[in-house]
Curated annotation (Swiss-Prot):
Tissue: Ubiquitously expressed.
Regulation: The N-terminal sequences of INSM1 and SNAI1 compete with histone H3 for the same binding site and thereby inhibit histone demethylation (in vitro).
Coiled-coil region list: 111-152, 429-515
Superkingdom: Eukaryota
SUPFAM superfamilies documented for this protein: FAD-linked reductases, C-terminal domain, FAD/NAD(P)-binding domain, Homeodomain-like
Cofactor: FAD
Record field: compositional bias (Basic and acidic residues): 139-152
Induction notes from the record: Down-regulated during neural differentiation.
Organism: Mus musculus
Residue(s) carrying Phosphoserine: 127, 132, 138, 167, 612, 850
This enzyme's EC code(s): 1.14.99.66
Official protein name in the record: Lysine-specific histone demethylase 1A
Biased composition (Low complexity): 7-26, 76-97
Length: 853
């Protein structure tokens, strides 16, 4: 299957490498396609030159990394990232730099963050790196350094390597920290702020500094107490002089932050009552986290909001199993760091019982034996190098298309693995060539020595005969004796030299035979452990590696949040339940059709318990938070009239929607190590690598939660619960012993792909897709004018959900932020922007077209 692609991959890699003339080192993103110097391949792996000499295989797989924690509606939520964001909305042009590499995450060292070191070698760097300390520092500097070291106290004793490091990274505090926590740069305006405050961005620098202080201080006041509404009056009262002198600017900043969900979001006590008269009617399809967040915002802005939910509960893919003392999340499960995460605010508003996830994750082989630490670390290091190599192929050699088809991460990894296997065979061949060459040299030498020995023997006989002539000998006879002696001495010396060379060759031959190179790149055992890491990466992305985009699969890595990953021990569903309080939600109501025109919208829905019962809802705007899996469904689950534009449907088709399933096992007692949150099970085959590969111990009650990822996630949905639970117990008995593992009291098996209201777990960047598609998914749709020549209509159909937020996809916080984003967009459209100057018009809405990326 891969043979046809091998030669092409090898040739492409060789050509690029020959042109680049690279050195060994770690590659940094952005090289070949940007016209900058090409970085070298990752150390320890066969470089592009080797690629040219042999077959290339398919590619295999970065987060994350990862694994991702539970997604907003999936089963695991990928690590988000901290970083400045241009307001809560990322525009179509805000592509993130590509990074690929590996790092440990708080969720466990098994999680790939898939980041490459951001290092670019320059000539100066290389020359400095090669200097010794004596060459680098002057004599005065060396003496001063020595004196300073004498005065320094001895370093504190380091903790044993086995111990968990509980320390958290330092984060900025004060107004600067408030901006950081809100994902904003503290010292400059974002592009969204610049668009909303043109008078400030075009004004003097001092005016911008005043704006930034007011903005950051307002954020700080909100974050200090997010349980109570932060009013304009309270903000003005607490602002220090002279920043409180410009009340108009303070009001504009407060209105902007409130409108865009940076303050007064989530569940908080209102100081000002909701307006009695509602302005504008909005129907929200779906009551997941994005829909609930948007609904609360729109309601607080004074709009009339109704949510239509097909399930008999709120939360969507945030689903918690509860029975007696047993609590376990079937969907979203992990908070991926609190530094910059809006869930940090929600966790203060809601009773979220957060607990850090310990990083230690022992692995157990198929026979139940623990994987030795040295073997575990060696394979994990190789896994990291393989990912770095695929990044090098993509970003430095631009090997992203093969036979006019986008290359997947899975293909790339197999390419690198096969190149490594070829490299091992090449080394074997070279080794045997050296042995054969040494043997030939030894054979030739021994033949010389045999011939020389015969000559010496013959010459010795001649010398003996010449010496036996009794004196007095004539001059001729004397000369003959001396010449024979001289020749004999020379031959003996030559023989001794050959004997010395013989010893060296025999020693070399012995060394070569005693130290053969490895005959395989990966033993079958190594490959099984490597497949465990691949399964973990498939968990992070909720899809087989063969479907992931090689170039863009980790495009959101720059926005990862800081801090430990945490679990919600009392169940993640406490969040949507709290968000739903006080909202108009129609449960068991499935939307069948959405009609949108220049004058308004109409939503047709049915009762899921009695499909003959139809409801029609008229409104000014519709916010669609349907999961991407439902939007991809064929035939369509929801009909749009008129049909969605081609640029929207193409984005839906290009993007990937993954699958990840869980098995919840509730026991009457703990039989595993209670100090460990994670332990892995290494499958026996590549095909089954994702089957029950990771067990989680997170809750107070004795519960184990097993994950099924990759190809196994889809296969498992067609197998009965009894068989799946039986397989789980067999694995656990192999690890802990048959007598130690009791029958579970309760079991639950998720099947997210079969769920008609989800059709999968969460989005991923499929081969052929990119971060641009998330931006396209977020774009609202404007109906065409009903009458030719009529004014350009306004947008009527809006979209939110984890699949619409480029920087934070496949996460609960991403869903939350997308809901806040769309609430601000809808309110600006129908209520006007309160933060604009009186002389400014509300920003116009562009005509409907394919958004330029």
């Amino acid at each position: 299957m891969l043979s046809g692609k091998k030669a092409a991959a090898a040739a492409a890699a060789a050509a690029a490498a020959a042109a680049a003339g690279t050195e060994a080192g770690s590659g940094a993103a952005g090289g070949a396609e940007n016209g900058s110097e090409v970085a070298a391949p990752p150390a320890g792996l066969t470089g592009p030159t080797d690629m040219a000499t042999g077959a290339a295989g398919e590619r295999t797989p970065r987060k994350k990394e990862p694994p991702r924690a539970s997604p907003p509606g999936g089963l695991a939520e990928p690590p988000g990232s901290a970083g400045p964001q241009a307001g809560p909305t990322a525009g179509p042009g805000s592509a993130t730099p590509m990074e690929t590499g590996i790092a440990e995450t708080p969720e466990g060292r098994r999680t790939s963050r898939r980041k490459r070191a951001k290092v670019e070698y320059r000539e100066m760097d290389e020359s400095l790196a090669n200097l010794s300390e004596d060459e680098y520092y002057s004599e005065e500097e060396r003496n001063a350094k020595a004196e300073k070291e004498k005065k320094l106290p001895p370093p504190p004793p380091q903790a044993p390597p086995e111990e968990e490091n509980e320390s958290e990274p330092e984060e900025p505090s004060g107004v600067e920290g408030a901006a950081f926590q809100s994902r904003l740069p503290h010292d400059r305006m974002t592009s969204q702020e610049a668009a909303c405050f043109p008078d400030i961005i075009s004004g003097p620098q001092q005016t911008q500094k005043v704006f930034l202080f007011i903005r950051n201080r307002t954020l700080q006041l909100w974050l200090d107490n997010p349980k109570i509404q932060l009013t304009f009056e309270a903000t003005l009262q607490q602002l220090e002089a002279p920043y409180n002198s410009d009340t108009v600017l303070v009001h504009r900043v407060h209105s902007y932050l409130e409108r865009h969900g940076l303050i007064n979001f989530g569940i908080y006590k209102r100081i000002k009552p909701l307006p009695i008269k509602k302005t504008g009617k909005v129907i929200i399809i779906g009551s997941g986290v994005s829909g609930l967040a948007a609904a609360r915002q729109l309601q607080s802005f004074g709009m009339d909001v109704t949510l239509l939910e097909a399930r008999d509960r709120v939360g969507g893919r945030v689903a918690t199993f509860r029975k007696g003392n047993y609590v376990a999340d079937l969907g979203a499960m992990v908070v991926t760091g609190l530094g910059g995460n809006p869930m940090a605010v929600v966790s203060k508003q809601v009773n979220m019982e957060l607990a850090k996830i310990k990083q230690k994750c022992p692995l157990y082989e198929a026979n139940g034996q623990a994987v030795p630490k040295e073997k575990d670390e060696m394979v994990e290091q190789e896994f990291n190098r393989l990912l770095e190599a695929t990044s090098y192929l993509s970003h430095q050699l631009d090997f992203n298309v093969l036979n006019n088809k986008p290359v997947s991460l899975g293909q790339a990894l197999e390419v690198v693995i096969q190149l490594q296997e070829k490299h091992v065979k090449d080394e074997q061949i070279e080794h045997w060539k050296k042995i054969v060459k040494t043997q030939e040299e030894l054979k030739e030498l021994l033949n010389k020595m045999v011939n020389l020995k015969e000559k010496i023997k013959e010459l010795h006989q001649q010398y003996k005969e010449a010496s036996e002539v009794k004196p007095p000998r004539d001059i001729t006879a004397e000369f003959l004796v001396k010449s024979k002696h001289r020749d004999l001495t020379a031959l003996c010396k030559e023989y001794d030299e050959l004997a010395e060379t013989q010893g060296k060759l025999e020693e070399k031959l012995q060394e070569l035979e005693a130290n053969p190179p490895s005959d395989v790149y990966l033993s079958s055992r190594d490959r099984q452990i490597l497949d465990w890491h691949f399964a973990n990466l498939e968990f992070a992305n909720a899809t087989p590696l063969s479907t992931l985009s090689l170039k863009h699969w980790d495009q959101d890595d720059d926005f990862e949040f800081t801090g430990s990953h945490l679990t919600v021990r009392n169940g993640y569903s406490c969040v949507p339940v709290a968000l739903a309080e006080g909202l108009d939600i129609k449960l068991n109501t499935a939307v069948r059709q959405v009609r949108y025109t220049a004058s308004g919208c109409e939503v047709i829905a049915v009762n899921t318990r009695s499909t003959s019962q139809t409801f029609i809802y008229k409104c000014d705007a519709v916010l669609c938070t349907l999961p991407l899996g439902v939007l991809k469904q064929q035939p369509p689950a929801v009909q749009f009239v008129p049909p969605l534009p081609e640029w929207k449907t193409s984005a839906v088709q290009r993007m990937g929607f993954g699958n990840l399933n869980k098995v919840v096992l509730c026991f009457d007692r703990v039989f595993w190590d209670p100090s460990v949150n994670l332990f892995g099970h290494v499958g026996s085959t590549t095909a089954s690598r994702g089957e029950l590969f990771l067990f989680w111990n997170l809750y107070k009650a004795p519960i184990l939660l097993a994950l099924v990822a990759g190809e196994a996630a889809g296969i498992m949905e067609n197998i009965s619960d009894d068989v799946i639970v039986g397989r789980c117990l067999a694995i656990l008995k192999g690890i802990f012993g048959s007598s130690a593992v009791p029958q579970p009291k309760e079991t639950v098996v998720s099947r997210w792909r079969a769920d008609p209201w989800a059709r999968g777990s969460y989005s991923y960047v499929a081969a052929g897709s990119s971060g641009n598609d998330y931006d396209l998914m977020a774009q609202p749709i404007t109906p065409g004018p009903s009458i030719p020549g009529a004014p350009q209509p306004i947008p009527r159909l809006f979209f939110a959900g984890e699949h619409t937020i480029r920087n934070y996809p496949a996460t609960v916080h991403g869903a939350l932020l997308s809901g806040l984003r769309e609430a601000g967009r809808i309110a600006d459209q129908f209520l006007g922007a309160m933060y604009t100057l009186p002389r400014q018009a509300t920003p116009g809405v562009p005509a409907q077209q394919s958004p330029s990326m």
